[in-house]
Amino acid sequence: GVVSEAADGESIQLSIDLRLQHVQHRELLRAMRETGASAASAVTLDAMTGEILAMTNLPSFNPNRRGQLDLAAMRNRVVTDVFEPGSTVKPLTLVAALESGEFDIETLIDTSPGRIMVGNKVLPDPRNYGEITVSRVIEKSSQVGVTKMAQAIGHEHIIVVFQRFGLGQLTGTEFPGERAGRLPDHDFWSAIDRVTPAFGYGLLVTPLQLAHAYAVFANEGRMVPLTLLAQAFQEIDHSASGARQIISPMVAEKVVTVLHRVTGPAGTAQRATVSGFDVGGKTGTVHKVGREGYLDDRYVALFAGVAPVESPRYVTVVVIDEPEGDVYGGGAAAAPVYSRITQEVLRIQNVVPNSAEPVSNDRRLAASREGDSRA
């Protein structure tokens, strides 16, 4: 007899958008050709729903040619490869500073004379920025300014904020081989150990973790669980989906304001701009580590951004591994890739431009060369 009537399973659909996947693949290939990089990755999220819209890694492989498979090319670098995030983590340090009550984005910090001694280490800026606001500290990616903020609020508070944003933890996607990264946990914190996490050294993250963290800024301070399944409903029930309010909407709004300024004429990410839209983000350039310490001539170039600024929803992280020559900084190697990917993200998602006459990146760059694209 029949124990129970059969029930049809539910239909599922992946959140991956093949059009965006193609765009990422095309633009990463272009970036590798132009920079001579050894590898590249990108991931795009919908911050409101937690959907992973595209995720690309190069070098790639053809699964139909099994005799030519390169195991290194089969890695899903977005979830398996970890790196020091460098200056892309400074917006999280900004969160710690704002929550401390000691700083606002217009608080002044004296960065003179353009360098600061911490223990026996000298941390320099590209030049002496003098007395600048906290916002300008992030715009210029001032090591001196961020160091003074870190010393004022304490490394404990910064690490707690990193933990709230999911750094050092698995994202919950259950991707095979996903790594949790690492946060510093010293038995003894030297003077330099207390400040380096604030500007992204001494910790390890994956591109997906970094994108998930930036999604908090794009979603009014809420962290939504990531998913590879397309969300069936336009109205997302955040309480039911496991979303958590990890920072206040006001703090998130202030951080987005600063991220937008980073792409402005005085910031390090002028080449991240997108015609017809206001975007925000942060550059990062980190030295790679060899057997005997940091390497002087090998870098990872990073950019993490949100768009559009007036109603942020889409987050993209770009990682360019070992770019060669003079085009090795996050602002020069990774930011233009973000710009081209995000242009297509917003077009495909039918986001209406806010400018009737879009200003091209080249015209905007010609207007000002004040920013340092290497930060």
For every predicted segment, state its role:
Residues 33-38, 268, 348-354:
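Surface-exposed helix-capping loop/turn segments at secondary-structure junctions
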Residues 1-40:
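Conserved, well-ordered alpha-helix/loop/beta-strand core segments that scaffold catalytic motifs
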Residues 24, 137, 338:
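A helicase ATPase "motif cassette" and its flanking acidic/Ser/Thr-rich regulatory loops
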Residues 234-243, 332-375:
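Short, gly/Ser/Thr-rich active-site loops of penicillin-recognizing serine hydrolases
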Residues 322-332:
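A short acidic/glycine-rich loop-to-helix N-cap element
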Residues 1-3, 7, 16, 42-87, ...:
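Beta-lactam-recognizing serine transpeptidase/beta-lactamase-like catalytic domain environment
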Residues 22, 30, 324-326, 347-348:
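Short beta-strands and strand-coil junctions in structured, solvent-facing domains, enriched
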